[in-house]
From Swiss-Prot:
Phylogenetic classification of the source organism: Eukaryota, Viridiplantae, Streptophyta, Embryophyta, Tracheophyta
Residue ranges, compositional bias (Basic and acidic residues): 16-25
Family: Belongs to the eIF-1A family.
Region of interest called Disordered, as start-end residue ranges on this chain: 1-25, 120-144
Full protein name: Eukaryotic translation initiation factor 1A
Organism: Triticum aestivum
Biased composition (Basic residues): 1-15
Pfam families documented for this protein: eIF-1a
Gene3D superfamilies per the UniProt record, alphabetical: Nucleic acid-binding proteins
SUPFAM superfamilies found in the cross-reference section: Nucleic acid-binding proteins
InterPro entries per UniProt: NA-bd_OB-fold, RNA-binding_domain_S1_IF1, TIF_eIF-1A, TIF_eIF-1A_CS
GO biological process: translational initiation
Keyword field: Initiation factor, Protein biosynthesis
Keyword match Protease: no
PANTHER family found in the cross-reference section: EIF-1A
Length: 144
């Protein structure tokens, strides 16, 4: 068998984990692009997202982001609209949590978009009846 003369394996090719993108410039949408919130992941590099204009689109994650940038339900993404297919789009960029908060503060995202959708931080809102907490009055306690 020939002797190994290489300079390492796949760990060398992977390189050091340098945090270059921790402070990146905020990218705003251009014409032909739209902000969207991922509703669910479909697999095979696809996801379903609801755009800011109210349209539900099937989004394709581009190859540059595939297996490098992990997208989950509830994430805010920038999608490129297709001029020949209105119900499909391509994911261009995933916004980090702080970038999404900045977009909402700048007024780019409407108030109806809920950030951190998977996490209910402040509990159920007024009017939601799916709570397990029941509050009794003093006279109700005496009857029990």
């Amino acid at each position: 068998m020939p002797k190994n003369k290489g300079k390492g394996g796949k760990n060398r090719k992977r390189g050091k984990n340098e945090a270059d993108d921790d402070k990146r410039e905020l990218v705003f949408k251009e014409d032909g692009q739209e902000y969207a919130q991922v509703t669910r992941m479909l697999g095979n590099g696809r996801c379903e997202a609801i755009c800011v204009d109210g349209t539900k689109r099937l989004c394709h994650i581009r190859g540059k982001m595939h297996k490098k940038v992990w997208i989950a339900a509830g994430d805010i993404v920038l999608v490129g609209l297709r001029d020949y297919q209105d119900d499909k789009a391509d994911v261009i960029l995933k916004y980090m949590n702080d970038e999404a908060r900045l977009l909402k503060a700048y007024g780019e995202l409407p108030d109806t978009v809920r950030l951190n959708e998977g996490v209910d931080v402040d509990g159920p809102e007024e009017g939601e009846g799916d709570s397990d907490y029941i509050q009794f009055e003093d006279e109700d306690i005496d009857k029990i």
